[in-house]
């Protein structure tokens, strides 16, 4: 799914996380995805304000030289969804079963998916 998004977006994808950069990079390396995001990782720890504020998403959009309204945010928490919505982005939520979808939709997610194979633009 990440490779598909990377190709579809011509490499213009980023990670915007509330976690610290070291942890994010470590996780991406462990799962073999670091190459898709090299130089495009943004941490809330490095922003004036972290989620639920939109700063990390706004920084990622600015780096990609795109309007946040043209960005798709993929989130798994209500705090992250709130941040994505505040940035003006379209937000989709990932919820591993048996997670409840209602809180994610109430926070502003436009769509909830339960498996990465469902992630198609």
Regions found by a protein language model. Name each.
Residues 3, 9-11, 21-22, 26-121:
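Asp-based, Mg2+/Mn2+-dependent phosphohydrolase catalytic module
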